[in-house]
Amino acid sequence: MPPKPLFPNVFPGDGAPRKRRLALALLAVPGLVPAVSYAQLSGAAAQPQPLDSPWDLRLAPQLEDHPLKDGAKPAAFVIADHTSGTAEQDLAAKGSAELRRGDAVVKADALHYDQDTDMADAYGQVRVINGGTSFAGPEAHLKVEANQGFMTAPKYHFNVTGGSGSAERVDLLDSERSVFVNGTYTACQCATDPAWYIKGSRFDFDTGADEGTARNGVLFFQGVPIFASPWLTFPLSGERRSGLLPPTFSLNSNNGFELTLPYYFNIAPNRDLTITPRIISRRGVQTEASFRYLSPTYSGTLTANYLPDDRLAHRNRYAIYWQHQQNFGGGFGGYVYFNKVSDNTYPEDLGSTNEFINGTQTLYQQEAGLTYNNGPWSVLARYQHWQTLPPSIAPYSREPQLNVKYTKYNVGGFDFGAEADYSRFRITTADATEGDRIVFNPYIAYGVYGPGYFVVPKVQYHFASYDLNYLSSSTPNSPKRFTESIPTVSFDTGLIFDRSVRLFGQDFIQTLEPRLYYVYTPYRDQSNAPLFDTAESDFGLAEIYQPNTFVGNDRIADANRITAGLTSRFIDPRTGDERARFVIAQQYYFANQRVTLNSVQAPVQARHSDLIVGAALKLGSGFMSETAFQYNQNNNQLVKSSIGFGFSPGERRVINVGYRYTRANTTLDNQPINQFLVSAQWPLTRRLYAVGRFNYDLAANRVVDGLLGLQYDADCWALGVGAQRFANGVNSSGQQNSSTRFMMQLTLKGLSSIDNGLVAAFRAGVPGYTALPSAPPPMSRFSNYE
């Protein structure tokens, strides 16, 4: 007896008009009753909707996932031009056949579905969609709900991650795992001829773990093989995954050709390790390991590299960098900052290979400390040591230091506090004074603030006690134990006026803010005190309203002076943005300052200080400007100036122009500065960007540092090239040496990327630089819903 056809009244036979007809085969449960409804609505949309026919489906306002109840089986839906089969057993469909069950969809010219085994056999233009992954090929055989089976000659696409490729065969293990034989993979979104792809004898994909593995993989770029490995792992979505990272290339005038082959270990979501062998043509093979870790209570980075038997230096070279932050709770914390190199010439020889070292660095800090912060209390206990490379002069180390601060605000209108500090100073320089110092600095201030004024009188004391265990031969008669007590009284007051003005067709609020700051500190002889941590303060708008002209606790300048300043601002009343600011200030002396940094310096003898003038503008269309001048009226000389202009009308469009001038740099190297600086990032075409920096010393007629690069941004790859001339080391006379390097960086979007220093150089050299966009954001699994 022939099998009874399904729905004989719905499909009258081959003689019916050839229009698309629907066979709704509900094979999941007996009686043709659906196991679960997949369109669950809310609100007005959840109300019963009138249907045009018994076989119409109600439309849902959005695509949603609704899990089945425990033990329930999803219904099976079949759409085709022609169907036949046995009720509750099997179904054959021909002509634009489509089978849906749960999340799985099978489309083909013809298919056969067995209800008992949940097995679907599809032939001709087959498409299988499950969990956001689609496969297309001539033939497929699979268990629909379990998504287990195989397809021949498939083309595949991961809708969520954007990856795609083809193979001779794919074996589907479940809804997340699949194995491809003799296939390809790419994250390029182009349908044909991808810019880069991986070709391998076998691919194992796990979309749940977001990981792909290629056996005998070869990475092609523009049809050219650029890398091969018997085992390649890579992320499917561009997220962090263990595996090889793209190699990087550079050419350095000191080291020759450099090639890096980094391997990334994604140990845990909060820990990773990168091992980077670096081939340096002139020196050998350097190995670097960088470990990063993060937790709710601590974080840090530990990086170390080692170059055995440097062929140029004829010795082993290494560098170590460790930065750690710890939160113990209850206001207690700790930290470690450790930076060390193997020898004096390491920075200039190998500094370009380290992101935490530059070629001119001569001081390396090695410090560990404990902190406490709770309310008004702040405590620091630390041990600090310095590694000093010539020609720098070694600073004093604190071995150890204990610093305690207490600060209270607005207690009956008073602000008061104190700082207590104990330090034991040690130094590696021979014949230098060493010893202990205790400092206690209390203060009290009373501030009166109103809508348009403020008045703040303040009294503070400086107490210091020295216990020196070794005296320099230059000061053999100085006492080893002595104390200092120095009071300071200051009075700070100002007014704030404002008015509405209209300039250039725009409304502004203009302020006028005069300010007077008076400070008195009596003279105390401090020539016996060594210079443990003290230097001359810079002189500018940030320092002109400070009581002491020195930084540190070994010198307190005597003072009887008043500072007069005037500030005017122009504020946009709609947004509150400050569009312009102009400042002028000067100090006037009632007595000469007698305290100097050392006995060689002459006391300050003048009626007033240099004049300080500054201006800042922030106009429309991305234009900004900051300018500052220090002018000596007695000598009619410009002592210091800084002029800067910035223009950034859009993303990745920025131009900076600056000029720096210093007649005499007494706090650094006593050398004048007369430099012109220009930097920019600008698009040349829709995809090509130019990046550059040029810093020229007008006094020495030489390039201090320069950078010129190009970046090309394609849909699924980016290429950057750059040439950089940079300061690298300091000679015995204190002048900077220079080196040149060439860098090239290829980024394969959707695979992985690593910076070989090119992007870091662009970002450091061009204020406002914006990196090229990464791969487009992943799509939803419903983006290409079928």
UniProtKB/Swiss-Prot annotation:
GO cellular component terms attached to this protein's record: cell outer membrane; transporter complex
* Signal peptide annotation: 1-39
The protein's superkingdom reads Bacteria
Q: Which family does it belong to?
A: Belongs to the LptD family.
What name does the UniProt record give this protein?
LPS-assembly protein LptD
Subunit text? Component of the lipopolysaccharide transport and assembly complex. Interacts with LptE and LptA.
Primary localization class, coarse = membrane
According to its UniProt entry, one GO biological process term is: Gram-negative-bacterium-type cell outer membrane assembly
Q: Which UniProt keywords apply?
A: Cell outer membrane, Membrane, Signal
Q: Where in the cell is it found?
A: Cell outer membrane
UniProt gene name: lptD
Q: Give the lineage.
A: Bacteria, Pseudomonadati, Pseudomonadota, Betaproteobacteria, Burkholderiales
Q: What does this chain do?
A: Together with LptE, is involved in the assembly of lipopolysaccharide (LPS) at the surface of the outer membrane.
